[in-house]
Amino acid sequence: MPFNPLSASLDAGTNAIDAAADATTRASILPERAAEIATIEVGQTPAEVVYEENKLELLHFESRTEEQNDVPILVVYALINRPYILDLQPDRSVIRRLLDAGHDVYMIDWNEPSRLDQHLGLDDYVNRYIDNCVDEVAARADRESINLLGYCMGGTMSAIYTALHPEKVNALGLMAAGLCFENTGGVLEDWGSEEYYSPREVVETYGNVPAEFLDDGFALMDPVDNYLSKYITLYENLESEEFVQNFARMERWLDEGIDLAGRAYVEFLEKIYQNNELYHNTLEIGGERVDVGNIDMPVLQIVGEYDHLIPPEASKPFNEMVGSDDVTTIEYATGHIGMSVSSSAHREVWPEVCDWFHDRSGTGVHTDEKEDNEFEAEADVAVVDGIGPTYADRLAGVGIETIGDLVDADDETVAEAAGVTEGRVAEWRRSFVMVDTPAGAKPGRSTADFDDH
């Protein structure tokens, strides 16, 4: 091809014309797309408020199957941002995924604290609010223990709650939960270090921690993407209605952050982040030590390989601290938010999570079905729900071989022999009725079906 000295200029001119035409096309649809962004709907799965306390609302989602699992799931989200990230859009909704798998699903919507709430601490959120919600869900389901699924800060609080109230939790699921903060490689660990940051000064200034303060901090962890790249990508995809709608839903969620109660913020930053007290098993809430060894029921950890907020090493070491011998970790190539909204996570991760809860919940025994759990004093202790052959062998070593022996023994002796918590012993006692209970003994009563873990 002969050399054309004008080719470069002609190519540049052609590219300019194409770019102008492209810009004109995008400009023509911009008003329509802007309207979509402004009116986009989120959190569309039908639910009713079944319990309220202060600002808190407990949501119960409408079932999507004819039959539901006997053991309900209570979803505990973080105290920051709105929980509808778990129900962002119908085809990428964790809530719907659980419902479609036959689970009975509840979720706590914390809503925004007022200035009057700035003195609420972790004790209030864990031992009052979460505990009251667990009791409400359990009562509505006619059960004595339920499943928990905690996300982010909600996962941390769920772990704390479970350690304090193990008898009320059948199985514990944790998503991107901050549980261990020592050399995790996470930016937040460095930024939240007591060497550089004092949460008390923030709270002394604001009372409650403003949502804008938190949002800007998270955005600055990846400033190029959060302040520039994503808007360029939006512009390049204005012609795609689906892309714009997905973008709008996420932006709405990011824009609707909520303030965080001041005292809870200080306690969380100082105790969990800076002092790593939960992982070191030295945390105290409400004057009671949070012994993570009490977490002896099935535990599931869902972690994102590329989670820049809660890296895998801020979650996985916790598995070695709990008292459970049934611990499962699902680590997936996604980020902190991607695990709840990405199409690949919904395809690869959530079916496994649904199955995990199903397999560890069983068909269950309701609290009013006493006739199914009536035993003679001479019955082998292994027949008690939750004991099984492993614990029965341990108990036999100290002479506890029958239902009558179990009734006569004190909780401390049983717990030490079996290698479980006294809370778990209380579960065993509640799970049966001895038809010939001796005078002065401690009869049990029927309860939920507890796994032998």
What are the language-model segments listed below?
Residues 295, 301-303, 307:
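Short beta-strand/loop motif that positions the catalytic acidic residue
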Residues 120-140:
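Alpha/beta-hydrolase active-site loop
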Residues 149-154, 158:
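Gly/Ala-rich beta-loop-alpha elbow adjacent to hydrolase catalytic centers
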Residues 36, 43-114:
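Short, surface-exposed "cap/lid" segments of acyl-processing enzymes
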Residues 311-320:
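Short alpha-helix in the alpha/beta-hydrolase fold that links the catalytic acid
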Residues 325-372:
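Catalytic active-site module of serine/aspartate enzymes centered on a nucleophile-bearing elbow/loop
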